[in-house]
Amino acid sequence: MIGLNTAAIYILQTLGSLYLLIVLLRFILQLVRADFYNPLSQFIVRATKPLLNPLRRIIPGFGGIDLASLVLAILIQLVLMILILMLMGYGVGGFIMQLLIWSIIAVTSLFLKVFFFALIISVILSWVAPGSYNPGAQLVNQICEPLLMPFRKLLPNLGGLDLSPIFAFLALKLIDMLVINNLAAMTGMPQQLSIFL
């Protein structure tokens, strides 16, 4: 029985986190004004449409921000946490507000991770395939550009040497360590849910 629960938790976490990532990417792509005609963007739009369209009737966008996809990401994270805790044998009845707070923290952590790994991919592509125009590379660059732009404005021109990714990495890591981890600790997030950070 324990083995079955462990397997169920693994499958639920893997599939749930994958769909959560797709939903959060939908939010990020609209946030950074990415090309929605990109084949990967179109896949993300189609994958999220069944759940997002009904939610959009209740939650409209605001200032160019796709609030419906952000709310959907938080709700998916909340359901994932509830189901995983229940499979572990914990009651969740009196902890819904805490679980909601932990869900927001976890989604924020994933948000930072998307930019972190997009930066890694962007740096690698700039070394091995500079000027590549495949859909994946184009989308990664569009995600990274708004993050790198403020650092490029602050840093001096070093004759083609772009140090902005290094400072962006440091900023993301500091936010993760000083804000996300501390918020999780301050709100008493249990060890069982740290898999989402």
Swiss-Prot record:
Location(s), subcellular: Cell membrane
Membrane topology according to the record: Multi-pass membrane protein
InterPro entries (alphabetical): CCB3/YggT (IPR003425)
Pfam families: YGGT
Keyword hit for Cell cycle: no
Keyword Transmembrane: yes
Assigned keywords, A-Z: Cell membrane, Membrane, Transmembrane, Transmembrane helix
One of the record's GO cellular component terms: plasma membrane
Regions crossing the membrane: 9-29, 67-87, 104-124, 160-180
Protein family according to the UniProt entry: Belongs to the YggT family.
Protein name according to UniProt: Uncharacterized protein PA0392
Originating organism: Pseudomonas aeruginosa (strain ATCC 15692 / DSM 22644 / CIP 104116 / JCM 14847 / LMG 12228 / 1C / PRS 101 / PAO1)
